[in-house]
Design a protein with these regions (language model features):
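A solvent-exposed interaction/effector surface
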Residues: 1-150
Length: 150
């Protein structure tokens, strides 16, 4: 899809270490967990859930991820809570859309990197890698209807 500007936002996050093979399973569990937390605490949701890749070790096949839910206002959680509020600062990025299940995730990431290289865009390592779940299993849809933005 090309270059776009990601607006800043506040979000709830739960951070875990996961094997890459279990990433989808963990995300599928944690998104409803965050939604339930926001509903129980009357926190207004302001967008679709997303994942931030804090680190990826492809050799060990593990990743540290934050499963996130955008919210309208900044909140403060109790000390020791497994859910915290953070802020995503706005930035310019390359946008790639994957239609279908996540088995094609690597191909989508490769297309984004190819776009960066082809168009001589600068890859800024300080900007987090995001996956936004526009339409997913949590919406009760079949895999062919899923849409993920990278």
């Amino acid at each position: 899809k090309g270059v776009f500007y990601k607006k800043c936002c506040y979000f709830l996050k739960h951070t875990i270490n996961t094997k890459l093979a279990r990433l989808n399973y963990n995300v599928k569990i944690l998104i409803p967990y965050l939604i339930n937390f926001s509903n129980q605490n009357q926190i207004a949701i302001s967008g679709k859930p997303f994942v931030i890749y804090n680190s990826i070790d492809e050799n060990k096949e593990i990743s540290n991820i934050s499963v996130c839910l955008p919210i309208k206002k900044r909140i403060f959680t109790s000390s020791g809570s497994d859910i915290i509020c953070s802020e995503l600062i706005g930035y310019t990025s390359v946008k790639t859309i994957l239609n279908g299940d996540y088995s094609h995730r690597k191909t989508a990431w490769k297309k984004a990197k190819d776009f960066i290289n082809k168009n001589r865009e600068t890859e800024e390592r300080a900007i987090p890698l995001l996956e936004v779940y526009n339409k997913s299993a949590n919406d009760g849809l079949s895999p062919s209807k899923w849409q993920t933005t990278f």
